[in-house]
Amino acid sequence: MLRRLAPLLAEFNFVPLVSKVSHKETKYRLLTKDYVSVVQPGAGLPEMLRVDPAALTLLSSTAFDDVEHLLRSSHLMSLRKIFDDPEASDNDKFVALQLLKNANISSARLLPGCQDTGTAIIAGYRGDQVFVPGNDEEALSRGVYDIFQKRNFRYSQNVPLSMYDEKNTGTNLPAQIDLYASKGMEYSFMFVAKGGGSANKSFLLQETKSVLNPKSLRNFLKEKLAMFGTSACPPYHVAVVIGGTSAEMTMKVLKYASCHYYDDLITKPDMKTGYTFRDLELEEEVLKVCQNIGMGAQFGGKYYAHDVRVIRMPRHGASCPIGIGVSCSADRQALGKINKDGVWLEELEMEPSQYLPDLKEDELLKTPAVMVNLNRPMPEVLQELSKHPVRTRLSLTGTIIVARDSAHARMREMLEAGKPLPQYMKEHPVYYAGPAKQPDGLPSGSFGPTTAGRMDPFVDLFQSHGGSMVMLAKGNRSKQVTKACHKYGGFYLGSIGGPAAVLAQNAIKKVECLDMKDLGMEAVWRIEVENFPAFIVVDDKGNDFFEQL
């Protein structure tokens, strides 16, 4: 006779999904001792930290002022190390030099480091002994509003008027604010300015148990990491999260990891302190994969990534979510905290010039740039470009039209309605970009390129109507663009993604709004440039630089 076995019951053992990280190496600067006080509520209750909402507004405003203009010293050191690596390509070093120059310019707080000053993202952890009268989110949002009004930033947030119609808010609000409960008498924060380029390179991949073995996982990551391409402005800080109790948890940890928030995480699973851990060995392997992809720091080489963070999490037995993402060369985040001693913000590097190498561009570039005069008929410009192979470095001078997503969509509507493509799209090169605000006394605000790939669906249509014959932007493009350029005799020129302040200060001489002013920063602009740097990426013969890597 069979006996029924009693089920084995595991003892209750609470283990946090992600163990607490200390950030003990982070250095902070004191903003103020105002707005905080310790109060005794009585009735046997513990003392409380009272935080005036003005403290949240000050911290938020100062944090975004800093991250838009300054970088962490660790990021700058990673750029500087490229010059000491004999395996780094000349292209790697050239891009790194531009990014360091850009950091030096933006540290003056007149031009932000990137024209896409991003979505304001705030994560806050409020201790149970912290009391804030009023609305925390409102106070933090006020700080975002204040600094975006004050500084030469860009308003990038669109709100829906209907399912299909939308408008720019003109404030960069709403911000994304996630607030959590924690223990203690401290309110801690992470502030992130996340641009569209790197945000769009966050991928959730729903896999299965079959990928959880060394060979399969390595092959999987080798294939998927190339999906980033160069449009999010490498060198990257790459993050990989394997597992997760839900899709949203995987992606949240991914974003935090790309910001180095979990650098202090345990490196082995611990049944008492935490299951989620960093795999340092796999991080080194994945970094080598990135170095061998060939894209390098945008135009070929080793430095596709500065570093890699790989985090393993618990998962449901039927699911294996994997998240991969990046923080780009505009690596913009800072920690903050409010405690009984005052309001504190992470120290970012205010003297980036110390990381500049004693090196001139001419020492890196073996051949001089081809000078291209854009102020002549388009057929002549195309004839000049056709003389040179992909990879050729150019120096552009003349008139360029600036148009991006919304302007392209409106022009397509014009064509669909039987109207002609605007003449300026036929007579001049088109630069995919959207400027930050123009500082007083300067011809341009920060004005770097946006991701070219988003405009790929428009290229064949526009070129068939004689427009977009020369395109200028950042990143690699799809085969449909290569085919269109081959068919119609067009070109795609790549610009370095990241050094938006350098371009504004050195290459852009005049900016004026030409058309579609109601689109805000996505309006059509006319700019005059002088020695604007670019590379031939796709030519009129069916060649694509990135396909040759």
Curated annotation (Swiss-Prot):
Function recorded in the entry: Catalyzes the reversible hydration of fumarate to (S)-malate. Catalyzes the hydration of fumarate to L-malate in the tricarboxylic acid (TCA) cycle to facilitate a transition step in the production of energy in the form of NADH.
Sites where the protein binds [4Fe-4S] cluster: C114, C233, C328
Pathway connected to this protein: Carbohydrate metabolism; tricarboxylic acid cycle; (S)-malate from fumarate: step 1/1
Regulation: Specifically and competitively inhibited by 2-thiomalate, which coordinates with the catalytic [4Fe-4S] cluster.
Quaternary structure and interacting proteins, as annotated: Homodimer.
GO cellular component assignments: cytoplasm; cytosol; mitochondrion
UniProt superkingdom: Eukaryota
Keyword tRNA-binding assigned: no
Coiled coil: none
Co-factor(s): [4Fe-4S] cluster
MF terms in GO: 4 iron, 4 sulfur cluster binding; fumarate hydratase activity; metal ion binding; protein homodimerization activity
EC number: 4.2.1.2
Matches recorded under Pfam families: Fumerase, Fumerase_C
Localization, UniProt: Mitochondrion
PANTHER family, A to Z: FUMARATE HYDRATASE CLASS I, AEROBIC, FUMARATE HYDRATASE-RELATED
pH dependence: Optimum pH is 8.7.
Cofactor, free-text remark: Binds 1 [4Fe-4S] cluster per subunit.
Primary subcellular site in the record, as a coarse category: mitochondrion
Catalytic function, reaction form: (S)-malate = fumarate + H2O
Organism of derivation: Leishmania major
Binding site residues for (S)-malate 2: N200, K201, S202, F203, L204, L205, Q206
Keywords: 4Fe-4S, Iron, Iron-sulfur, Lyase, Metal-binding, Mitochondrion, Transit peptide, Tricarboxylic acid cycle
Example GO biological process: malate metabolic process
Family matches, as PROSITE patterns: FUMARATE_LYASES
Keyword Glycoprotein: no
Protein name: Fumarate hydratase 1, mitochondrial
Family to which the UniProt record says this protein belongs: Belongs to the class-I fumarase family.
